[in-house]
Amino acid sequence: MNNSLVAVLAALCLNACTVSGGKEPDEGTEIDPLLSAQTLAYKTVGEAFLTPLTPADNIDSPASWTAPDGSVWLIATAKATDKLVVYDGDTGHTRTAAGGSGAKLGQFRRPNGIFVADDRVFVVERDNRRVQVLALPGLQPLGHFGEAQLSAPYGLWVDKTAQGYEVLVSDAYMDGEAVPPAAQLGHRFKRYRVRTDGGFHAAHLGDFGDTDAGGAVRIPESIWGDAKHGVLLLSEEDQHAGTQLKVYGRDYRYAGLTVGKG
C-alpha cells in the first residue's frame, strides 16, 4: 500500500531542565512560542479540512494510509484517552476509533508517535514503554516490543528492509526530573528489527546518540529519515539548547549539521 506521513515539528517552550507533575519533557512551561515570532523563514500551508474538535482526546501525532479502494485514512493517536482515531483523509470526518486503556494487545497507555508502513501501524506508547504493531484495515494487534529497553518513548521512524522493518524509537529518559548530562545521552535512540510475516518477531539491534555538545539530543521526540539519501532528522526540543533538527547519517552518527535552530 502507498503510505504518506505528514510530520509536523514545532518549537516548544521548556524550562531549564525539569518537568513536573504529569507533564512531558516538552511541556515545561505554560508559554507556547509561536513560529511567527521567530526569525526563521517559513511558509503557511492552507487547511484542507478540520477534524472534529475533541479536546478530551488530546490528539497528538498523525499518519496516513491509502486503502485498497483508494480512500485515504488519517490515523491519529489520542494520548489522553488511550486510543487511535481514524479520520477520512479527504473530509476530516471521523471513521472509527480503536483501543482503550490497558497493557493488553490492542490497548494503549499514552500513545504518542505513530508510523504506517505498508499495511502495518506502529504506535509508541509512553506509559506502557513499548511499541505496538497493528494490521490495517481492521487494526488487529499483532504484537509489541521494547519494554526491556525503553523508559519514556515518544517518536519513531520505520524503514522497510529485506529483513523486515527497521524501527528507530526516541527515548526521553530523565535523570530524576532533570535532563541527563551529555555523557548519558548515548542511548537516546533505540534500533529494532521487526518482522510480521510468519508470526511476530522483534529484536533490539542497539542504541545510538551523540554525547558531544554539538550532536547530543537533550530532549528528543520526533524522528524522520530519508532512506534514499541516508539522512536522519532528530528533533531537539530543549529550548535552552535551541529547538532544532540534528542531522545524523544512516551510520547513526551526528553529521555535523543542524537545521532551524531557534
Describe every region a protein language model picked out.
Residues I31-D57:
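A short helix->beta-strand "capping" segment at the edge of beta-propeller domains
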Residues L74-A80, V123-D127, V167-A183, L232-Q239:
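Conserved beta-strand positions in repeat-built beta-propeller and related beta-rich domains
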Residues G46-P55, H93-L105, Q140-G146, H201-G214, ...:
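A short beta-strand motif characteristic of beta-propeller blades
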Residues N15-A16:
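C-terminal motif of bacterial Sec signal peptides marking the signal peptidase cleavage site
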Residues R129, L136-R188, H201-G214:
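Asp-box/WD-like beta-propeller blade repeats and closely related beta-sheet repeat scaffolds
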Residues T54-P68, A103-A117, A148-T161, D210-V231, ...:
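Beta-rich, blade/repeat-based domains predominating
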Residues D88-T91, A135-G138, V194-D197, Y248-D251:
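Short loop/turn segments that connect beta-strands within beta-propeller blades
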Residues A48-K83:
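Beta-strand-rich domains and repeat architectures in extracellular enzymes and scaffolds
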